[in-house]
C-alpha cells in the first residue's frame, strides 16, 4: 500500500504520500501527552512552582505552540513536526489544475517565492494547527466530565437526566452559559464529532487516490496544501541556518564593546537560536526514548544490576528488642548439628538467648503473631522467613526484610496458612514460640500456647494474626500490598 501513491504520482515528486502525512500527524498528536507526563513527574518534585502550570497545561501548551509554529512557518514554511519530515506548506494557485510543472522545473526559486505563505496565510495555518486542536481537546474534556457519565447511565437503564443541571429560578449569565454548554455537549457534540472524523476520512481517501490536493478539510478551507521540500527550499533553509550575510553596519555593530559573547545571550539572538535548536532536540529525544524502551525490554540491564548486587554484602536489618546477628553466630555448635540443612529446624533449635515476647498491638492490646528473625548465617541468607524455603520472586517489605512474593502477599491479607493454623489453634506457627527473657512469663506463655495447640482451642480474640503487618517485626505496613517492592538478588 505504501507504494500505491508513488505509482500514481510519478510525475509529481513533490507531493507527499498519505502515509507520510499520517506519520507526521501521529507525531504531532504524541507531543502534548508526552510533555504533560514529563511536567506531571516534575510537579511531584516541585509542586510549588509547577502545579499551576500543570493545571493550565492546555493553555500553556497552546501559547508555546503558537510561538514555535509561527517561527517555523515564517522561516521554514512548515510546522515543527512537518519540518522534521522535510515537508512544507504552500499556497495553491488559482489556475485550472493548480499546477505549473514547467515553471517548477525551469525556475524553482521564483516559484517558491510566489507560493510562499504570506502573513495572512501564516495566521490561517496557525488557527488550523493550534486553535482547532486546542478547542477539540477542551470539548473532549468537557464531554468526558459532563456528558459521558450520563450517557453510560442511559445505556445501562439509569436515569435520563440530572435534576441538579436544571436552571434555577433566577439564573445568572454564567449559569445560563454552563447550561447551554452542557446541552451542546450532550445533544450536538456527538454528531459534530462524528462529522469531524468522517470529513477527515473522506479527504484522506480522496487524497490517497489523487482526487484532491488537500489531505484535510481545514487545509481546503484556507487554500493551503502540504508539499515536500525542493532543492530551492533546502538552499533557502541552509542560508537561514548559516545566518544573514554581514554588512558594514553589522560588522561595526559587532565590534562594539559587549556585543561579542554577551551578544549571543541577548533576546534578539537567543530567541531564534533556541527555536532552531528544537530541530535537533526532537530526533535526539526520539532516539533516547527508543533506547530506554530497549534498555527496559532487554535482559542486559538486569544482568548489570545482578552483577552490581553480587558484590554487595548487605546485613539484615536489626529491630529494637530482637537478637542481633552477632549474638546468633555465638551459639554452641552442638545445638545446630541436629539438621543443618533444614532452616526450619535451625529456628527451632534451643539457644542460651531466648526470643522476646511477641509485640503488643497499640490499639487492641493483644499480642501479634510474628515469625522469628531469620538466621544470619550465609546458608539461610536467601531463605524466606515465613515459609523457610528458598526465596521465590523476592519482594521487600517497608521494614527492610525480604520475603517470597506469595508469602508476604497472603500474610498482609491475613490469608497465609501459618496465620490460619496459629489462629485456629492447630499449631504454634510451625517454628514460632513466644519465649522471653523472663522465665515465669515465658513458661506461662509457652504452656498456654502448647495447651492451645493440643486442644485445638481458637486464638481469635486473644491474638492478632499479623494481618497488614510485617511478619518479622509486627509493624504496620503502609498501603498494604501496594507498598511491596520487587528486588533483585
UniProtKB/Swiss-Prot annotation:
Residues 433-442 have a biased composition (Acidic residues). The keyword Transport applies. Pathway: Protein modification; protein ubiquitination. The chain crosses the membrane at residues 18-45, 50-74, 119-156, 173-209, 281-308. It is found in: Peroxisome membrane. GO terms for molecular function: ubiquitin-protein transferase activity; zinc ion binding. Zn(2+) binds at residues 384, 387, 404, 407. Component of a retrotranslocation channel required for peroxisome organization by mediating export of the PEX5 receptor from peroxisomes to the cytosol, thereby promoting PEX5 recycling. The retrotranslocation channel is composed of PEX2, PEX10 and PEX12; each subunit contributing transmembrane segments that coassemble into an open channel that specifically allows the passage of PEX5 through the peroxisomal membrane. PEX12 also regulates PEX5 recycling by activating the E3 ubiquitin-protein ligase activity of PEX10. The three subunits of the retrotranslocation channel (PEX2, PEX10 and PEX12) coassemble in the membrane into a channel with an open 10 Angstrom pore. The RING-type zinc-fingers that catalyze PEX5 receptor ubiquitination are positioned above the pore on the cytosolic side of the complex. The RING-type zinc-finger is degenerated and only coordinates one zinc ions, preventing E3 ubiquitin-protein ligase activity. Belongs to the pex2/pex10/pex12 family. Component of the PEX2-PEX10-PEX12 retrotranslocation channel, composed of PEX2, PEX10 and PEX12. This is Peroxisome assembly protein 12. It comes from Emericella nidulans (strain FGSC A4 / ATCC 38163 / CBS 112.46 / NRRL 194 / M139) (Aspergillus nidulans). The lineage of its organism: Eukaryota, Fungi, Dikarya, Ascomycota, Pezizomycotina.
Amino acid at each position: 500500500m505504501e507504494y500505491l501513491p508513488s505509482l500514481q504520482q510519478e510525475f509529481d515528486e513533490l507531493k507527499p504520500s498519505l502515509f507520510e502525512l499520517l506519520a507526521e500527524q501521529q507525531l504531532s498528536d504524541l507531543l502534548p501527552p508526552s510533555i504533560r507526563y514529563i511536567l506531571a513527574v516534575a510537579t511531584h518534585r516541585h509542586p510549588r512552582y509547577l502545579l499551576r502550570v500543570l493545571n493550565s497545561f492546555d493553555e500553556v501548551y497552546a501559547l508555546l505552540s503558537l510561538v514555535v509554529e509561527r517561527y517555523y512557518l515564517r522561516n521554514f514554511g512548515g510546522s515543527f513536526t512537518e519540518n522534521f519530515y522535510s515537508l512544507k506548506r504552500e499556497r495553491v494557485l488559482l489556475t485550472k489544475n493548480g499546477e505549473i510543472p514547467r515553471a517548477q522545473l525551469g525556475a524553482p526559486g521564483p516559484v517558491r517565492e510566489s507560493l510562499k505563505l504570506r502573513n495572512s496565510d501564516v495566521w490561517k495555518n496557525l488557527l488550523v494547527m493550534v486553535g482547532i486542536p486546542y478547542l477539540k481537546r477542551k470539548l473532549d474534556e468537557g464531554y468526558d466530565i459532563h456528558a459521558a457519565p450520563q450517557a453510560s447511565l442511559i445505556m445501562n437503564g439509569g436515569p435520563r437526566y440530572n435534576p441538579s443541571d436544571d436552571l434555577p429560578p433566577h439564573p445568572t449569565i454564567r449559569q445560563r452559559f454552563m447550561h447551554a454548554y452542557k446541552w451542546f455537549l450532550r445533544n450536538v457534540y456527538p454528531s459534530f464529532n462524528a462529522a469531524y472524523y468522517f470529513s477527515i476520512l473522506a479527504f484522506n481517501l480522496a487524497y490517497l487516490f489523487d482526487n484532491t490536493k488537500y489531505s484535510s478539510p481545514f487545509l481546503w478551507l484556507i487554500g493551503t496544501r502540504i508539499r515536500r521540500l525542493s532543492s530551492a527550499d533546502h538552499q533557502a533553509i541552509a542560508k537561514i541556518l548559516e545566518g544573514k550575510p554581514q554588512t558594514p553596519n553589522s560588522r561595526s555593530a559587532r565590534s562594539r564593546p559587549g556585543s561579542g559573547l554577551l551578544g549571543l545571550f541577548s533576546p534578539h539572538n537567543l530567541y531564534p537560536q533556541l527555536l532552531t535548536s528544537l530541530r535537533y532536540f526532537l530526533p535526539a529525544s526520539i532516539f533516547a526514548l527508543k533506547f530506554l524502551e530497549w534498555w527496559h525490554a532487554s535482559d542486559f540491564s538486569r544482568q548489570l544490576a545482578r552483577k552490581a548486587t553480587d558484590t554487595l554484602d548487605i546485613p539484615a536489618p536489626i529491630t529494637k528488642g530482637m537478637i542481633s546477628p552477632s549474638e546468633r553466630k555465638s551459639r554452641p555448635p552442638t545445638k545446630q548439628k541436629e539438621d543443618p540443612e533444614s532452616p526450619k529446624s535451625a529456628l527451632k533449635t534451643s539457644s542460651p538467648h531466648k526470643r522476646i515476647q511477641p509485640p503488643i498491638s497499640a490499639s487492641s492490646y493483644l499480642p501479634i503473631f510474628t515469625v522469628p528473625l531469620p538466621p544470619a548465617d550465609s546458608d539461610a541468607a536467601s531463605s524466606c522467613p515465613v515459609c523457610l524455603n528458598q526465596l521465590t520472586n523476592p519482594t521487600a517489605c517497608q521494614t527492610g526484610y525480604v520475603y517470597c512474593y506469595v508469602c508476604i502477599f497472603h500474610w498482609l491479607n491475613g490469608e497465609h496458612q501459618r496465620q490460619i493454623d496459629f489462629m485456629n489453634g492447630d499449631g504454634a506457627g510451625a517454628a514460632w514460640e513466644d519465649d522471653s527473657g523472663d522465665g515465669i512469663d515465658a513458661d506461662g506463655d509457652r504452656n498456654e500456647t502448647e495447651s492451645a495447640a493440643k486442644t485445638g482451642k481458637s486464638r481469635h480474640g486473644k491474638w492478632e494474626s499479623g494481618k497488614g503487618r510485617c511478619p518479622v517485626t509486627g509493624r504496620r505496613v503502609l498501603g498494604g500490598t501496594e507498598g511491596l517492592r520487587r528486588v533483585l538478588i
